[in-house]
Amino acid sequence: QGRSESSGAGQEQAREADSGKGQDEGQEASKGASDTKIITDHAGNQVEIPNQVNRVVVTDIFPIPSIITVLLGSGEKVVGMNPASMSAARTGLLGELFPDILNAGTDFMNGSDINMEELMKLEPDVVIYSAGSKELGEALRAAGFAAVGISVNKWDYDSIETYDQWIALLSEIFPEKEDTAERVSQYSHKVYEDIQGRVAGLREEERKSILFLFNYSDTTW
C-alpha cells in the first residue's frame, strides 16, 4: 500500500509539473506572439515587424528619412540611410532642426549596392526600400531583415495621395504616432486646397510655367 500511495503521489507531481511547464510554454508563446505584428507593404508583401520599432534603416527612397524624423519629432530611430539622404540632411534644414539624424550610418551603401554585413551591424528592426526594387526586397528578406516596401509610383505620381499612403504605412510601423500622422495628412490637404483656391480664378495666360529641379550639381540636374 505504501508503494501504491508513493507511486500515486509521484504521478500527481509529474502531472502538476507537466501542467506548469505547459502553462509556462503557453505564456512564452503568447508573449512572443504579442511582440510582433503583420503589416502589408506597398508591394503587397506581408511583413512581420516588432510592435515597438526602435531602429529603422532606409535604403533607396531618399525623402523617407526626413518624413520619419518629422513624424516622430526626432531622428533617433533612423539608424541608417542612403548617402544622398544624408547629404540633404547636412545641407538643409533637417540636420539643423533634428541634429540626431546626422548620427545615422551610411557606410552600408555604395551607390545602389548594399553591403549586407554592414547593414547587419546597424541591427535594424525594419529596413525600408523602394517597393519597385523587387530584387532588393528579396535580397533583404533572404538576409533575414524585416523589409518593408514603400512605393513612389503606385498612385500614378499623385503627390498628395502618395504622401498620404506613405504616412499611413509609417503610422503602422510607428503606431504611437498615429494621431500625428493624421494631423500631417490633414495639413497637406489643407495646403493643397488653399493653393488651388488661390489659382482657381486665373486665366490660362496668367498661369506661370515652373521648372522644378529635384537634384542639381555643376554637372548634372
Question: What label would you give each PLM region?
Answer:
Residues 1-52:
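Short, low-complexity disordered leader/linker segments with a strong preference
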Residues 39, 46, 136-220:
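Extracytoplasmic substrate-binding proteins
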Residues 47, 93, 100-113, 150-164:
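A structural signal for short loop-to-beta-strand junctions that line the ligand-binding cleft
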Residues 55-59, 79-82, 126-130, 147-151, ...:
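Structural recognition of the beta-strand scaffold that forms the well-ordered cores
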Residues 58-122, 126:
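A short, structured surface patch at a secondary-structure boundary
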Residues 34, 42-44, 51-54, 73, ...:
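Extracytoplasmic
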Residues 43-72, 216:
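Conserved H-X4-D acyltransferase segment
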Residues 62-65, 84-87, 126-127, 132-136, ...:
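Solvent-exposed loop/turn segments at secondary-structure junctions
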